[in-house]
Amino acid sequence: MAAQNEQRPERIKTTPYLEGDVLSSDSGPLLSVFALQEIMQKVRQVQADYMTATREVDFTVPDVQKILDDIKALTVEQVYKIVKVPSISFRHIVMQSRDRVLRVDTYYEEMSQVGDVITEDEPEKFYSTIIKKVRFIRGKGSFILHDIPTRDHRGMEAAEPEVLGVEFKNVPPVLTAEHRAMIQSALDGSIIENGNVATRDVDVFIGACSEPIYRIYNRLQGYIEAVQLQELRNSIGWLERLGQRKRITYSQEVLTDFRRQDTIWVLALQLPVNPQVVWDVPRSSIANLIMNIATCLPTGEYIAPNPRISSITLTQRITTTGPFAILTGSTPTAQQLNDVRKIYLALMFPGQIILDLKIDPGERMDPAVRMVAGVVGHLLFTAGGRFTNLTQNMARQLDIALNDYLLYMYNTRVQVNYGPTGEPLDFQIGRNQYDCNVFRADFATGTGYNGWATIDVEYRDPAPYVHAQRYIRYCGIDSRELINPTTYGIGMTYHCYNEMLRMLVAAGKDSEAAYFRSMLPFHMVRFARINQIINEDLHSVFSLPDDMFNALLPDLVAGAHQNADPVVLDVSWISLWFAFNRSFEPTHRNEMLEIAPLIESVYASELSVMKVDIRHLSLMQRRFPDVLIQARPSHFWKAVLNDSPEAVKAVMNLSHSHNFINIRDMMRWVLLPSLQPSLKLALEEEAWAAANDFEDLMLTDQVYMHRDMLPEPRLDDIERFRQEGFYYTNMLEAPPEIDRVVQYTYEIARLQADMGQFRAALRRIMDDDDWVRSDGVLRTVRVKFFDARPPDDILQGLPFSYDTNEKGGLSYATIKYATETTIFYLIYNVEFSNTPDSLVLINPTYTMTKVFINKRIVERVRVGQILAVLNRRFVAYKGKMRIMDITQSLKMGTKLAAPTV
């Protein structure tokens, strides 16, 4: 029984290399991993040499499937939360007074604890702290009120106290009955009104909320109240067009009843995606290519043609000496099959992936392999006209191989008249003197290869993605035609194939001509399938834009390097024969196909958020240069990357390009205007608008040094002292008089430190009861409360650090202005047993640091003012209403099987 209950290990699915006529089954993500490995082999050759002299880089190939799963998880992530009560914006600290309390704005109290301490020499930490504070604002204010707790008061609906955003439960126990009745009367007046927002019934009430948080809440509420009906219609209409292009029916399942009166819906993402957002990312061409393969390429099998074709044409005789007959019965190895995959990847991504010949001494010594590859290579690949599958070197090598094959007289001799140039194929052959020069590669016209006298790139009806309007037509085949493999291709032909048959007959290669004539239907089905895959499945935001596609071939010929250079993959000679004898037959559509538009939208949205963050951080560097003395643009690039979702970083860095992005790449990307609209982007921009006031981030440059005695009042009347609610703070109500303030810049401080007079100068200013301000430096501010004497490091702490040391007979001084500053509140508590001098010390206690922030963080208020902060309008959705995120409806529905598959 134990043996039966023992779980069997899960079988790992592997890709078979040879099962009858079917060679292998490759899915999109699997092919993307393979393509990424091969592409990275080429990319690393340059990168590794460059990095040898600098630093080590992790070149491990990332898991593409895991990255896709992580991005899918981002599509269901909500940037808002649905709550019953808003967060507490104001709390109260009870003192010994019966009619006075301290009201604390909890936003500033919590914000002061967010992030690290800012210093002058760590700009990356400064940027990271700013981003954390901005994200705190966005997260704190991104809430939707739903089903708030209410109570009945004399037939009217009133809000429960916890809904108002003010925490005061600790106040009533210390109040008199008269004051408690006054507060209760104010609470009874918090009536909830019925409202109507976008034809939906809602509750409207007045509550309390801090200004930065309310800005985010208001932006979110405005986003919802705007309904976005037109955006939804545009998205659905675009999905219908995309579904028609990709043979996918759009599902209305999620949208069945979203228009009902009891439903509030939120559309967090929009379609179509702005392709400029994706393609503006620096050094992103390889990453976008891999994402295109992973999200769109179908699962398929490599199918061999009918074996009778070769048996009745090439191997019909007992003795076979021709190169084709020799290779007919060969079986590919695993490495050769990998080369076949590369060939089909190059055919599916013309121009983006091009092929070159692998240096293999063994195959170069085998003339039969080279000659066969020279013939089939001219029928498999396109070299010029509008795009190319080959490098110039490979095209020339194929020309030389075809030249050798035509001159290989193994059956009968034919007449050959050589031309004057000595170039490959510069001769006329046969009785009719066929001019073989036409098969020599010409990248300007495409002669000699599949693009010869063929319209292989077409622009017709507008495509869903505006940046990729082209339609690829290998061999002149229209991808709109339906394919029946049993009959398709019969009677079809194209110019290059016809000319190849004519040339083979002229050269006396009748058996080979018969073989190619019989292979023509199989060959046409092959390229018809490839055309359909390119024009339907692979059409994506990750498709290469038309302007870049059109520039690939001219740049390749001219040797110019642009943003989207083609990737060169090496293949062996014999793999061309195996690729010609096998066709990629799609069996299943890619499982990511219907969710791909949503993945593209969330990726573009995250990129837009990153771009907005970097723009504001770069602006910040110009606003406060003194706190960012050693800052470089690369610092805010790294800070934004560190706080971005891991999945988005992984996609951007699929080819490890982040190690090679320079300042020019980054600043060019940041200054480009393209953005992808989304709810997250709208809230991020609003959060940055709130963060423009640095005091809302609990950062300030108005920190003063001033000697002040800690109050030590006499307790002559303890009852009166308690009723006043006595407290002390180093927070200033207003800046000091300007004529009593000495502005201390870095230059002044350094000069006096060099003269050894820094402390003496400050002492003289303090003795004159003046103030010292350190100019232009932002400082991190913390807020703390004490009911006993604060520690000495807070009381006597200075708003700068000054260290001196001696080394080698020289004195060194270090001055830092950017230090942590603490705003403290000391609440005095006394008992009736205290004597009049209980708070008096023989030696006074001094405080040295004063802070001015133009915000009401803490204030002493009377009991009647506790609810005076209820001045914000809130909209809450009724409990019987449904709040529905319809972002998931932006997925296409059921994939239709391709006809005749």
From Swiss-Prot:
Subcellular location: Virion
SUPFAM superfamilies reported in the protein's UniProt record: Reovirus inner layer core protein p3
This protein's UniProt keywords: Virion
GO cellular component, one term: virion component
One function term, GO molecular function aspect: structural molecule activity
InterPro entries assigned to the protein according to its UniProt record, in alphabetical order: Inner_layer_core_VP3_Orbivir, Inner_layer_core_VP3_Reovir
Location (main, coarse): virion
Function: The VP3 protein is one of the five proteins (with VP1, VP4, VP6 and VP7) which form the inner capsid of the virus.
Protein name: Core protein VP3
Species assigned in the record: Bluetongue virus 2 (isolate USA)
Gene: Segment-3
